Regions:
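Extended, composition-driven regions rather than compact fold-specific motifs
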Residues: 128, 163, 170-174
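Short, well-structured alpha-helical segments that form the helix of a local strand-helix-strand
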Residues: 22, 157-162, 166
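Conserved mixed alpha/beta catalytic, RNA-binding, or beta-rich assembly cores of soluble enzyme
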Residues: 9, 16, 20, 26, ...
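Flexible, glycine/charged-enriched surface loops at secondary-structure junctions
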Residues: 31-45, 106-118, 143-153, 168-182
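Short amphipathic alpha-helical surface micro-motifs
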Residues: 40-44, 52-58, 98-100, 163-168, ...
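Residue-identity detector for threonine
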Residues: 15, 50-52, 56, 103-106, ...
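A generic, well-ordered mixed alpha/beta core segment in the N-terminal half of proteins
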Residues: 2-68, 73-75
Length: 182
């Protein structure tokens, strides 16, 4: 959960912490009878490793911003894609595109392609990981981007990575095909 909190937000009458409110919302959503999503969060991950069965506690990132509103971006996802996470600290002369194209085939089908690649560039290892996860909250607008053309280096990278990864032919569920990333 990514939360943007306006500096002028007032929490009058709140009886729970914001973490508790978010976790209660996640708990209620995962316990709905019509929920088809798998619960995949563990209590005591270093010990008994029992499933909480409601995907709490949620992983929450906060950002304080100007204004008087609160904005939530929630990814209802399991941990399988996290298991395929890769991180590297590249030298300035190394190619980001080459590293991604070399790395995607090593992930096998466990990330359930076709999918999205969250790529965080810059900062510390921790910052890059958060940037990568946050990038997955963006709209899938690659067709619009291709139509209008890239306007900066990040947009050029997005198109180049998509084209080269799809050219690998990994396809749906790793069984081959034209579309590996969206």
């Amino acid at each position: 959960v990514f939360v943007k909190i306006g500096m002028n937000v007032s929490w009058e009458g709140a009886t729970m912490s914001l973490d508790d409110m978010i976790n209660q919302g996640v708990r209620q959503a995962y316990n709905l009878p019509e929920n088809v999503l798998r619960a995949s969060i563990l209590a005591d991950p270093a010990g008994k490793r029992t499933n909480t069965k409601d995907n709490t506690p949620a992983v929450i990132h906060y950002q304080v911003v100007p204004g008087d509103s609160v904005e939530f971006h929630v990814a209802a996802k399991g941990g399988g894609s996290e298991n395929k996470s890769k991180m590297v600290m590249l030298n300035p002369s190394d190619s980001i595109v080459d590293w991604v194209v070399k790395t995607v085939p090593t992930m096998g089908a466990g990330w359930c392609p076709p999918g999205m690649l969250g790529i965080g560039i810059g900062g510390t290892a921790e910052k890059a990981a958060v940037l990568a996860k946050e990038s997955l909250m963006d709209s899938i607008d690659i067709h619009e981007l291709r139509k209008r053309g890239p306007q900066n280096r990040v947009e050029e990278l997005r198109l180049e990575i998509m084209d080269k990864v799809n050219a690998l032919g990994i396809g749906a569920q790793g069984l081959g095909g034209l579309t590996t990333v969206l």
